[in-house]
A protein has these predicted regions:
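Glycine-rich, charged/polar anion/phosphate-binding loops
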Residues: 34-36, 106-107
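Glycine-rich, small/acidic residue-mixed loop/short-helix segments
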Residues: 172
Length: 186
């Protein structure tokens, strides 16, 4: 990892990726929070659930020389913009493992719940369960299928639930991520 912006730019221009990047082993069920301004990439075979602030900006420094299917050219990179926005030196971040608890038929893993940033839980349901969440939430099915309050959901689909809906009742065998947000420290 580069210790200064000058070193970062030098290693980038020389394409010395092994000096510039840290490669992390991805544990099954591991969680990692990647703060804004952190240079990162997702390796082959890794399933991610990305939650980000309201922004329509992605800057690329390196893109594995992938071809854009619509233009048939290499995807654009923006090294100068990256140099201006990346955190240098960067904080060392690692994958974390969180314990699960069993609540009303759901295996619940609470990954993150930071006011002003995001909330992320994992709910694993085997046949039946229920869960109470008092804020709006997006429930995304990452494995299996079932219903949420009678609404069908299957892998790759998301259901939005407004705030103050009360208990969510689940039927089926499914693995869900619950993503939400809160302003206050409650």
């Amino acid at each position: 990892m580069a210790g200064s912006k000058e070193e970062f730019i030098e290693w980038t221009l020389k394409k010395e990726w092994k000096k510039l990047l840290r490669y992390l082993w991805t544990p099954v069920d591991g969680f990692i929070n990647i703060p804004t301004g952190t240079l990162h990439a997702i390796g082959k075979g890794v399933l991610t659930y990305n939650i980000s602030r309201n922004a329509d900006l992605t800057l690329r420094l390196y893109d594995y020389d992938r071809i854009d299917p619509s233009t048939h050219k290499k995807r654009e990179i923006q090294p100068q913009e990256v140099f201006e926005n990346v955190n240098i030196p960067d904080k060392k971040i690692e994958f974390q493992m969180f314990p699960a608890s069993y609540e009303f038929g759901c295996k619940v893993t609470r990954y993150w719940d930071e006011p002003g940033l995001y909330t992320l839980f994992r709910l694993q349901i085997d046949e039946n369960g229920k869960f109470l969440h008092d804020r709006f939430a997006f429930y995304t099915c990452v494995k299996g299928k079932g219903t949420i309050n009678g609404i069908p959901i299957r892998q790759g689909e998301t259901v939005f639930v407004p705030a103050c809906m009360g208990w969510m009742y689940f039927k089926g065998n499914m693995d869900l991520f619950l993503a939400s947000y809160r302003n206050e420290n409650v």
